[in-house]
From Swiss-Prot:
Protein known as: Putative ABC transporter peptide-binding protein BAB2_0812
Record-level GO cellular component terms: ATP-binding cassette (ABC) transporter complex; outer membrane-bounded periplasmic space
Pfam families named among the record's database cross-references: SBP_bac_5
Organism name: Brucella abortus (strain 2308)
Subunit structure: The complex is composed of two ATP-binding proteins (BAB2_0817 and BAB2_0818), two transmembrane proteins (BAB2_0815) and a solute-binding protein (BAB2_0812).
Length: 527
């Protein structure tokens, strides 16, 4: 099929995927902002436990808070619940001076809460996704109620970046729950308390969460009385709700942007996603053991055509896990579209004996028409060289239950189409590739055990000289390009659309939703 006709057919299929599936709407009171804050890549995680969160921080940070946080441009890490912090010259001691803050039940936030949180986050029994990332912590000390001292076993230049995602938790509310029972405890969706500008009020399962203003917030009472997060099974339904005025914000795909950009009733927000989209090869599945098969996979996909035809040019090809110029050396393989070479590589690998035309499931949590069309394009291209993939789309909780399951069958997900944060700090990619991060320790869900990749990552993580750090991550780029633990596709821009009625509203297309300084206490809506 010619590409032009093929993509015309895909455009038609997008209309089919866009059928409305509406979430029940709560009554809108004056002074209420409602949004689809978890619409988009990753979607709703299925729980409100920040220790287990791999996304959804745009919403979580409205009522939970970390010690430190990125600014809204994702350029600098600044204090949040820590009013100040300093790092010792040997980079082994981090000292945080805490702000005067209260939990939503009126109890004071103290250093004991911070230590309690870090102890939970380092304990794999809690289901924490941070256990491996915080393994370099030797101790957490509390010399007084407003001081926290973290001591490391060895320098960890990525430590501050990790701490931006560790939301502080109340010791007095959670200490009685055994660590192994914490992950799925009802507390997270019924009576959670944080220190943020909004307080948890109620959750109507799979419909919406309602927060109310925290009158005692240290940054001042929020400008609106309520903040509501609506859940949508279909992104098209969120767009319809935005147009009708039921919500004032949602994520949109690049192919929806043009319908809003010329409408003064809305504001389009665009930015770098810092997320590399990739095809993951499950390394416990024999299909992908031969590098030539993985190379053939790359040469079979016309990434440039997909980027131009489906992403509207709003993406950049990724030939390794990074696209930032400073992290990508010139002498790497571009894996140019070459179906003839793909067939040759498959012949050399003996693909007909390995699998031939048998169907191979490619699992994804991306539920948008755009990604459905992307996978359809990949399916057609790969079929031309003799690889038969069959897309399977599930919601994020189901996806996580499959890929993180211990003792599961690798055949459940021989391939995935997913995304993982590769910035603002380049160390963030480590959790998906390093052998030490294989679940339950981390998020190396493809069970990658490639010594060259792990060695390059470890060297980059240990580099404390800023002048040498980029060169170390160039080595990571070289290792992932040569060994293909993933088939890296592209890094795309991301978009949000906000009603022009919103004032002081900050949304940044950050990986995993941030967190970053969004100042939700300053958000307002024109009546």
């Amino acid at each position: 099929m010619r590409l032009r006709n093929f993509y015309s057919a895909l455009a038609l299929s997008a209309a089919v995927f866009a059928g409305p599936l509406y979430a029940a709407a709560p009554a809108m009171a004056a002074g209420t902002i409602s949004g689809g804050f978890d619409v988009g890549p990753g979607g709703f995680q299925g729980n409100f436990n920040p220790l287990a969160a791999t996304g959804g921080f745009t919403w979580l940070v409205t009522y939970f808070e970390p010690l430190v946080i990125y600014d809204d441009k994702l350029e600098n890490i600044v204090g949040d619940l820590a009013k100040s912090f300093e790092i010792s010259p040997d980079q082994l001691t981090y000292t945080f001076k805490l702000a005067h803050a209260k939990w939503h039940d009126g109890e004071p936030f103290t250093s004991k809460d911070a230590k309690f949180t870090f102890d939970l986050a380092r304990n794999g029994k809690t289901g924490s996704v941070f256990a491996a990332r915080l393994a370099s912590i030797a101790s957490v000390e509390t010399p007084d109620e407003k001081t926290v001292v973290i001591k490391l076993k060895e320098p960890s230049p990525s430590m501050l970046d990790t701490l931006t995602k560790v939301m502080m938790l109340p010791e007095h509310a959670l200490a009685s729950i055994p660590p192994e029972q914490l992950a799925k405890n009802a507390w997270w969706s019924s009576t959670p308390i944080g220190t943020g500008p909004f307080k948890f009020n109620k959750y109507v399962a799979d419909q919406y969460v309602e927060l109310t203003a925290n009158p005692d917030y240290r940054g001042g009472r929020p400008q609106v009385d309520k903040l509501i997060n609506r859940y949508f099974a279909d992104p098209a339904a969120a767009i319809a709700a935005l147009r009708s005025g039921e919500i004032q914000f949602t994520y949109v795909d690049s192919n929806d942007v043009s319908t809003f950009s010329s409408d003064s009733a809305f504001r389009v927000i665009e930015g770098d996603s810092f997320v590399v989209n990739y095809v993951g090869f499950n390394q416990e599945v024999p299909l992908w053991k031969d590098l030539k098969v993985r190379q053939a996979f790359m040469h079979a996909i016309n990434r440039d055509a997909i980027i131009q035809s489906l992403y509207g040019g709003a993406a950049k090809p990724a030939n390794c896990v990074y696209v930032a110029d400073r992290l990508v050396p010139k002498a790497i393989d571009a894996y140019a579209y070459d179906p003839q070479k793909a067939r040759q590589l498959l012949d050399e690998a003996g693909w007909d004996k390995i699998n031939g035309s048998k169907p191979i499931t490619i699992l994804t949590y991306y539920n948008s028409p755009l990604v459905a069309n992307v996978l359809a394009a990949m399916q057609a291209m790969l079929a031309q060289v003799g690889i038969n993939i069959v897309p399977r789309t599930v919601d994020t909780p189901t996806y996580n239950s499959i890929v993180y399951k211990q003792g599961g069958t690798a055949d459940e997900f021989p391939l995935i189409f997913a995304g993982l944060q590769n910035g603002p700090d380049p160390s963030s990619i480590n959790i998906g590739l390093n052998e030490k991060q294989i679940p339950p320790a981390g998020s190396n869900i493809m069970r990658i055990r490639m010594p060259a990749v792990t060695k390059a990552l470890d060297a980059a993580l240990a580099e404390t000289n800023p002048a040498k750090r980029d060169a170390r991550y160039q080595d990571v780029c070289k290792a992932t390009n040569a060994n293909l633990p993933w088939g890296t596709m592209w890094v795309a821009n991301r978009y949000g659309v906000a009603s022009s009625k919103l004032e002081n509203f900050i949304w940044t297309p950050a990986p995993a939703g941030g967190p970053y300084q969004a100042h939700p206490e300053k958000w307002a809506i024109l009546e």
